[in-house]
Amino acid sequence: MRKVTKMKKWQASVLVCASLVCLSACKNQSANQVDNQSGDKQGQVSSQTAKQGEVVPDFELTGVDGKTYRLSDYKGKKVYLKFWASWCSICLASLPDTDELAQEAGDDYVVLTVVSPDQKGEQSEEAFKKWYQGLDYKALPVLLDPSGQLLASYGVRSYPTQAFIDKEGRLVKTQPGFMDKVSILESLKAMN
C-alpha cells in the first residue's frame, strides 16, 4: 500500500514539474530584453508605451509579404493586433482561427499579427520567413518587428498577447494568453 502512495506522489511531482516547464515555455526570458543590434533593420516603432484608454503610437513595419504596414492606415477601423512566436504551441494552434478572422474582416475591423525575429527566443528573420512560407495562411498579415520595440511598447511579456485598438486609435485592452475566435469577435464588437 505504501508503494502505491509513494508512486502516486512521485507521479504527481513529475506532472507538476512538467506543467511548470510547459507554462514557462510561452513566457519570455526577460520583460525588458531588446536587441539593439537589429535597430538598423527596416521598421519604425515609437519608444512610447501604449497605455489603456490613450491613443497608441503609430508604427511602420514590413510584413513577410514585403508590404509596409502602418497602424495609422487603419484609423476608422478597429484593430486586433496579435503578438505571437513560431515556437509557441498555443500561438500555432490559434493561427487557423486568426486567419479566418482576417478573411472575414470587413469595413469594421482589421487583423494584424506581429512576430519579432531574434527576440525572446524567436528565430532569425530569414529563418522565420522560410518557415512561414511552408504554412498555408493566405489572409493573415504577419508584420516583422526585428527590433522588439513594438513588443516593449505594448508590454508583451508572454505569447500570445492580443491588443485591441478602437476606431480612434486608443488602446482598449491588452489580453495575454489564448483567446478563441468567439471571444475575439465579442471584444471587437464591444468596442466603439
Say what each PLM segment does.
Residues 1-58, 192:
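N-terminal targeting signals for export/organelle localization
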Residues 58-79, 103:
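A short beta-strand-turn-helix
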Residues 164-192:
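Thiol-/selenol-based redox modules, centered on thioredoxin-like
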Residues 109-123, 139-147:
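Thiol-based oxidoreductase modules, predominantly thioredoxin-like and allied folds used
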